[in-house]
Amino acid sequence: MKKKDYYEVLGVSKTASEQEIRQAYRKLAKQYHPDLNKSPDAHDKMVEINEAADVLLDKDKRKQYDQFGHNAFDGSSGFSSNFADFEDLFSNMGSSGFSSFTNIFSDFFGSNKSDYQRSTKGQSVSVDIYLTFKELLFGVDKIIELDLLTNCSVCFGSGAESNSDISICNNCHGTGEVLIQKNMGFFQFQQSAKCNVCNGAGKIIKNKCKNCKGKGKYLERKKIEVNIPKGIRPNQQIKLSQKGHASINNGVNGDLIIDIYLKESKVFEIVNNNDILMTYNISYLDAILGNEIIIKTLDGDIKYKLPKSINSNEFIIINNKGLYKSINKDKRGDLIIKVNIVVPKNLNKKEKELIEQIYEQTSFNPENNIDQ
C-alpha cells in the first residue's frame, strides 16, 4: 500500500517550521493516542503520526525525505517487511553481535516482554499557554483544566473489587508471556508471545471493580495550578513532573509539559532578548517645550523630562525596566521607547491664532537637501 505523504499526515505545509510540526504532532497525539482513543484504527494512526514526526523533526531525515520521498528510507536504509521472522532468527542464535543488533530493532518496535513485566512511565501531556506581555514580564499563576488518565479511587488501579479477587494466571504463571515453538527450515525456535488467557497482564480478576468496570483507570477532569515565573521567555517549557497521565502498568505518572507562547501585542516587542520596545505618542507641544510627561509602562506610570525639540523616531531609554534576564532573578533589560510626535488634526480658533503668530515670527525652516 502506498504510504501517505508525511506532511499530509501531520497536516502541515512543506515549509512548516520545527515548532509548527511539533505543535501539529502534539495535537494529533492527543487525538489518536490509544490510551485516550479507543477506536480500532487509533493504533495504526498513531504509528503513522509517530513515523511522520520522527522524519520531519530530524533535519537530516527531513532533507532526505524532501529530496527522495519515501524512497529515501527504502531498501538498505529501511526495514524489511519480514522483520518479525528476521528478528526471531537472530534473537535465538545466541551471538552477542546479533543480540545487540536485535536490541536496535527492539528500540524501534518494542520488545516481546509483556506490559505486566515492564513498569513504564505514564504518557506525558503537552499544553500551550499564551501570556500577555505583563504576565510574561512579572510571572503569573494559571489554572488549567485537563482530562487525565487517573488511577481508580476505589481499587487504586488494580481493576479488582478486592485483593482477594486477584489471582495469578495459571497459563503464563504470572509472567504475562507464553513460549511458542516455531519451525524455520531445519531449525526450531521458541518465541515469547503475549498470554492469550490474561492478555499479558499475568493475573486474572474474578470480580471487577464496579467503579472503573475492571479497567483500573478512567479519565478525570482535573484542575492544575501552574506557576509561571518571571524571567521566562516565549518558546520555553515548564515541566511539572508526574502531573500527566497515570501509567497503565504500575509505573509513575507521566509529566505535564507547559509550552510558553506570547500573545501578539500592538504596543510591545521583545528586542535584544532582554529589552522591551514600545512606540509612545507625545504631544507636539511637549516635544517643543521639553516638558515633563507621564509615560504609561508595564511597571506603572513613570515621570520623564523630555529633552527639548525631540523628534519622531528618536528613542528614550529607561534603564532596568525591560524583561528579567533570568528566571526569578532581579536583573533586567531596558525599556526602549520610540517617540511618535502627534500633531492635532483640528485646532480651535484661539490655538490657530497663536500658532499663526508664532509662524509669522519664527525663523525656523527645516532643511531639505535633494542634491545627490
Curated annotation (Swiss-Prot):
Residue ranges of the CXXCXGXG motif repeats are: 152-159, 169-176, 195-202, 209-216
* Gene Ontology biological process: chaperone cofactor-dependent protein refolding; DNA replication; protein refolding; response to heat
* Record keywords, A-Z: Chaperone, Cytoplasm, DNA replication, Metal-binding, Repeat, Stress response, Zinc, Zinc-finger
Question: GO cellular component terms?
Answer: cytoplasm
Any one GO molecular-function label of the UniProt entry: heat shock protein binding
Q: What is its main location?
A: cytoplasm
Alphabetical list of Gene3D superfamilies matching this protein: DnaJ domain, Heat shock protein DnaJ, cysteine-rich domain, Urease metallochaperone UreE, N-terminal domain
Limits of the J domain: 5-69
Listed binding positions for Zn(2+) 1 are: 152, 155, 209, 212
Q: Where in the cell is it found?
A: Cytoplasm
Give one Pfam family. DnaJ
List the PROSITE patterns hit by this protein, alphabetically.
Answer: DNAJ_2, ZF_CR
The protein's required cofactor(s) are namely: Zn(2+)
Which parts of this protein are zinc fingers (CR-type)?
139-221
Residue positions annotated to bind Zn(2+) 2 are 169, 172, 195, 198
User: Do you know which NCBIfam families this protein is assigned to?
Assistant: DnaJ_bact, PRK14296.1
The entry's family comment says: Belongs to the DnaJ family.
On assembly, the entry states:
Homodimer.
The free-text domain note is: The J domain is necessary and sufficient to stimulate DnaK ATPase activity. Zinc center 1 plays an important role in the autonomous, DnaK-independent chaperone activity of DnaJ. Zinc center 2 is essential for interaction with DnaK and for DnaJ activity.
Function recorded in the entry? Participates actively in the response to hyperosmotic and heat shock by preventing the aggregation of stress-denatured proteins and by disaggregating proteins, also in an autonomous, DnaK-independent fashion. Unfolded proteins bind initially to DnaJ; upon interaction with the DnaJ-bound protein, DnaK hydrolyzes its bound ATP, resulting in the formation of a stable complex. GrpE releases ADP from DnaK; ATP binding to DnaK triggers the release of the substrate protein, thus completing the reaction cycle.
Q: What is this protein called?
A: Chaperone protein DnaJ
| Organism field | Mycoplasma mycoides subsp. mycoides SC (strain CCUG 32753 / NCTC 10114 / PG1)
